[in-house]
Amino acid sequence: MEDVQNSPAKVAMSIDRVGVRDLTLPLVVRDRESGSQSTMAKVALSVDLPAHFKGTHMSRFVEALEDWSEELDYQSFYNLLSDILRRLEAERAHAELSFPYCLQKKSPVSGRKGIMSYECTVEGEMVGDNLEFTLGVKVPVMTVCPCSKAISDEGAHSQRAVVHIRTKSKGFVWIEDLVEIAEASGSCEVFSLLKREDEKHVTEKSFSNPTFVEDVVRNAAMGLEKHSKILWYQVDVESFESIHNHCAFASIAKPK
């Protein structure tokens, strides 16, 4: 049969990335407490395309993913991208997996357990034999405005914020490590289950530890600086301001 994809392109221009996205894949990831956990990932796969080819072979991405059934780590990601490079005869391959990661978390006073879900992303780009691997997680925290507290006779405005951490490392890093760094950066952690005594604790703790969005991003960056395995990071914090019709944000990236 005619291979239309390998025919000459009418416009001889190279393409940085071409591929497939929104594939759904059962995934096993490493869990610090129980060893591993099963989740579902949304997957995007792509390669570069030289100027002289009309198109890429989309089915080969799906074939590579179907043949990949390893637990997610650096080596298994390396194997997936190596296979994509080979199948599509490309120079550069990229993969992104987004998935929920669940942790059972105790309420601070009652000790009642509730499931917290964190949005995680693993990205990889391979050129030749070199793989650049990035792990990311989004973690909700609570913030109380220091200015509002300082100028008010009673109370202060508080809100939820999201700390988005992305890292490159020398060796394996637990997702839990990043979650703990993020949760320690705000006025207080967020919990899925709170009884009255827990709610009292969270309220009092957060109001005794007011933080601007600037404080949160700096605290998270400092925690990442202290981690022995993290080589590079980017932290983005977005605060969903309760008294404004806009959000506040701050970002710090370690130079590469």
Swiss-Prot record:
Pathway as given in its UniProt record: Cofactor biosynthesis; 7,8-dihydroneopterin triphosphate biosynthesis; 7,8-dihydroneopterin triphosphate from GTP: step 1/1
Enzyme class: hydrolase
Hydrolase recorded as keyword: yes
UniProt EC number: 3.5.4.16
MF GO annotations: GTP cyclohydrolase I activity
Entry keywords, A to Z: Hydrolase
Keyword Transmembrane: no
Bilayer-spanning residue ranges: none
Biological processes per GO annotation: tetrahydrofolate biosynthetic process
Site description May be catalytically important, residues in chain: C145
Catalytic reaction(s) noted: GTP + H2O = 7,8-dihydroneopterin 3'-triphosphate + formate + H(+)
One Pfam family this sequence matches: GCHY-1
Signal sequence, start to end: none
PANTHER family found in the cross-reference section: GTP CYCLOHYDROLASE MPTA
Function per UniProt: Converts GTP to 7,8-dihydroneopterin triphosphate.
Family note: Belongs to the GTP cyclohydrolase IV family.
Protein name (database record): GTP cyclohydrolase FolE2
Encoding gene (name): folE2
